[in-house]
Amino acid sequence: MTMPDLPPDLVEEILSRVPATSVKKLRSTCTQWNAIFKDERFTEKHFSKAPKESMVLMLKEHRVCPDKRLVVWNPCLGETKWIQLKVDYRRYVSKFCLGYIQNNESRRSYKILRSWYSYDDKSSPRQRDLGFEIYEFISDSSWRVLNDGNTYLLAYDVEENSRVVLMFDFTTERFKRLRLPHFQDVGNMDLSVVREEQLSILHWTRNTSKMEIWITNNIDTDATLLWRLHLHTQVFSRNCVRVFSSLYIDKEKKVVLCCNVNDDATSKNIVYIIGEDNGYYTEILFLLPINIHWVLLDRNKKWYSSIFNYVPRLVQIYNGHLLFFS
């Protein structure tokens, strides 16, 4: 018996267990299969039954674009959506976070949180213009300002002169403060996510070259956030900037993949692969500085490559609307 001879329900059941990266290759194989892949109901089934894959994406060469738009991109399907920004990006430094809420039909409705502040090195943090905006995919609406599900951000409390983790709940559209681990000395931090289930903090003290990776309990529960030390090692190279631009953690092998920039005149982008207790350490020259950056941008500022932990999903952007984001 061949696949065309099988009952449609059985065909759908088989395809729902195919990895997302393989589904992409099958879209052009059969008109019937392609119709199944575009069905929102199938996307939900595929999310729950297909094996979870993990990939590392790296942003290599930053481009200076004379535009005011944000792009949402699904690398798995190659679909994109361009979104017009409300506030002039030239006057502000912006950060974007993608999150979702669960609707009544147990489907995910996605939103984008934008935080922005005025870029003025001469002004104190208290004097800078600061704001938040929300964009909702379900209505393809314009940006709306926030006056006062979740995404997590490292933040600095000006009043208490301390660092905190801010959780933004996309359902209530409110911020909540979460505590960080207790560190014996001041260092630099980077926040990441492990398998979409746990938060991780990279803490690095440059004076001692000591690096620690802390991981929380599962963040998809209502339990109190607890931190535990997962990995500690030494960073052999001191010739790098104080902040790692991004990181990826292999929890089982206790290895961290970091992307950074040398602190010398070359400003080379380097990938560091570091294991626990100095068991493994290597540096890989990833990208030489691009001259166009120094022509168009401030020559005194360093520009980083970034690493992203990406799990392929059957995200469908149809006629500019995000139908389902798993």
Curated annotation (Swiss-Prot):
<dbReference type="InterPro" id="IPR050233">
    <property type="entry name" value="A_thaliana_F-box"/>
</dbReference>
<dbReference type="Pfam" id="PF00646">
    <property type="entry name" value="F-box"/>
</dbReference>
<protein>
    <recommendedName>
        <fullName>Putative F-box protein At3g22710</fullName>
    </recommendedName>
</protein>
<dbReference type="Pfam" id="PF07734">
    <property type="entry name" value="FBA_1"/>
</dbReference>
<dbReference type="InterPro" id="IPR006527">
    <property type="entry name" value="F-box-assoc_dom_typ1"/>
</dbReference>
<dbReference type="InterPro" id="IPR036047">
    <property type="entry name" value="F-box-like_dom_sf"/>
</dbReference>
<feature type="domain" description="F-box">
    <location>
        <begin position="1"/>
        <end position="50"/>
    </location>
</feature>
<dbReference type="InterPro" id="IPR001810">
    <property type="entry name" value="F-box_dom"/>
</dbReference>
<dbReference type="InterPro" id="IPR017451">
    <property type="entry name" value="F-box-assoc_interact_dom"/>
</dbReference>
